[in-house]
Amino acid sequence: MIRGWALQRVWVGLAAVLPLLAHAEAAEEPHRLPLTLAPDDVLATGNEWIALPEIRASDGALVSFNTLFMRERGLLQPNGAAGRPVLEPYLQVGSGKKQPLDGLSWSLLEYWIPQAREERDGLTVTLTYCAPPGHRAAFLRLTLVNHRAEAVSATLGLKSSFGSLSRVTYVPVVLRGERLVAPTPWVDPGEAYSYITYDTRFSWAVVHPGSKATLSMPPVVAAPEADAARTVTLQPGESAESLFVLSVGLEEFSAAHNARALKEELERNGSNAVIAATAAWCRARTRTTGRADLDALMNRNLLFTTLYAWGRTLDTEELVGVTSRSPRYYVSAAYWDRDAMLWSFPGVLDSDPEFARQVLEYALGIQLRNTGTHSRFIDGVVLEDGFQLDEAVAPIVALAAYVRATNDGRFLERYRDAVATLRDRLVSRFDPATGMYSSLQDSQDEFQKLPFLTYDNALAWRALRDLGELYDRLHEGGAASDARRRATALHEAVLRKAVVADAPGAAGPILGSATDGRQHVTTDIPPGSLLKLPILGFLAEDDPLFTRTFEWLHSANYKYSYSDRRYGLPGSYRLPFTSSWTVADELMLKRSHDKAAQILLASPWDAGIITEGIEPDTAVPDKPGRAFATAAGYVAHAICATACQPRR
């Protein structure tokens, strides 16, 4: 089991050097990416401790935020009262009404830090959300510049509200308990919101240097709330800023002092320097293709998979992996080996090899005992049962990719026993009659009556080849030879047993997706598509068997081909649309790269963040699969694998 101290040192050290980093990067202006957003779009930002997944484009309000909790086996998510956002920034000019920021133009600094600007009657308002790495907090900055010919009095404010607390694993479940607001203990000025059952179980705080707050409690209002504001008088050409620090804690003191630490960082170095340091952290994890459009999509999703498929639990300080830290994804905050190791991990390895090492420590630690089981909670306990072969071998494939990329033999030696455990689990699924390996469920998490899945066995072949390499490095010649022998035999078995001779409309034999050695299923399974076989190295892209399979899946003979649709690529009964995995797979194939690239750039996705798929006629993204953090890594990796320039 991974313990937090080793990984914590990395983040604590990072936080300690933030001031130095800010100074070093002061001369480099952060890259600014202008955004075109719809009124109902949201933006996400955050760090390893706190996620801000729903910043509304329409007014800059924060709908919800969350933090990971091992005790809760998922996320804890504060929500505002009666459908309101949890945070609502506003501007009040003179004695007028408090006005939302409803005319914002958005951009991202270094693909991750949301910043919005609004021109209003000779005033410029700028809103920035920033979550510096290493802090159990984020901050919201409001700045105002007076371009008028006369002085102006204005109030910069932030309303906060605590309507409910939800535990999120898959879906939000509202928890029953008491919610209170009170001044932050030993930190002034600020408010601490508490969730209490027999004791405080969670707290969050808003600390606002220079602003004063009015607190309200039921029955006067529906839920605990506060309104923090600062009034300034600006002469022509003058500017002012207000800072609001949002933090999380186990109880009121930790919430307050987590905010205090970031407040002091801001006071010492200034908000511009802290933003610049955060931007520098992001910049160090980006890549370039030489094309601005590809860079924008790739880097936004590299950062999203790094910070939304992975995070640190507030109560145990352990790094954990999840499908997504955003409640917009329909099965958020749970762990799948496939998602973590086959989809997110390649993007993480492209972006940050050191972090990829930490990710593997988690997969080969607390999650190892149930590797291959459908889905688990973040502590490794089974959530949905059912064996899936592709998940069982996923950590082997990821570990081999890491060792190839880094030559980190010491890490491999440390996890020698884990490699043996994974090998034995794979071998236990071997069927002597067919020479293949069985699975209960497929890569789209559905039961398959026919137990031998073609893609899963091709991936198992890849894993056996990888085991041969790993055991060579571990100087275990016998184990290496055995793995290679098994790989060769499996390759032959798949080509003997998984080929369908009479698929309707096919130009010849093609690969089916599943078999029992006699019967076959002719379909595709997009998360574990037959299109991946050349990418795995199992078949050459110009192999006639693969060519016929590719053409059949893209023809009218396959019910879910969507070949007659403008943005159509093969789907399935479970995924009746163009999936993001298929876009990524076809991007990595020579024959379909150009069409996949066109589809990739045609869709708005979820305001630029990868979703589970898009509508084949319009490229409009599906709603249940929004903010899909692990798939974001897979698509970003596909872009990088085909277009990235070498690191300097």
Question: Which residues make up each language-model segment?
Answer:
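Well-ordered alpha-helical scaffold segments within catalytic/enzyme domains
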Residues: 283-290, 341-354, 394-411, 458-477, ...
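Beta-strand-rich N-terminal accessory domains
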Residues: 25-88, 113
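C-terminal catalytic domain of Rieske-type non-heme iron oxygenases
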Residues: 378, 565-571, 597-632
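Extended ligand-binding clefts on enzyme/binding-domain cores
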Residues: 333-337, 431-432, 450-459, 473-474, ...
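Aromatic-rich carbohydrate-recognition surfaces in CAZymes
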Residues: 240, 331-432, 454-457, 626-646
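The feature captures the catalytic groove of carbohydrate-active enzymes
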Residues: 240-241, 245-263, 329-330, 375, ...
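Acidic/polar, glycine-enriched structural segments that form the non-catalytic walls/loops
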Residues: 25-33, 124, 130-333, 648
